[in-house]
Amino acid sequence: LDAFMNHSGEGIPLLLDAGHLAFAGGDVLRAIDNHHARIGHVHVKDIRRPVIDVLDRSKQSFLDAVALGVFTVPGDGSLDFGKIVQRLADHGYEGWFVVEAEQDPKKNPPFRMAQVGYKELMRVMTAAGYTVETQGFGAD
């Protein structure tokens, strides 16, 4: 990521995908610190560390990892989105946060997972000082 950002123009923004970066072995907080001025959009996708820990990268592909359930929504995985969102807030990020999860809907019902992700994102964004306007999704 650093090499790409250092060799691309300042006008090229970064879509920070926390789950993909963590899956690839990157440090999400370090990426925010190093490239905050160019972050234009954030995907808040979580990872399941136990899936990564047993993945044989010499034999299993990215798609295999997805099928095994490596990704999930915030609040259901291993990343600390409280720290991630706070770091973004500390650097003045004011763009979109989009919950994303690539997972099997038969194993993880989409509406329930959307509720889990929404609840966690609202919790960490409020704690980081963001004002969030909602249209009622996820209300109890």
Stretches with model-predicted labels:
Residues 1-16, 20-140:
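Histidine-acidic metal/acid-base catalytic patches
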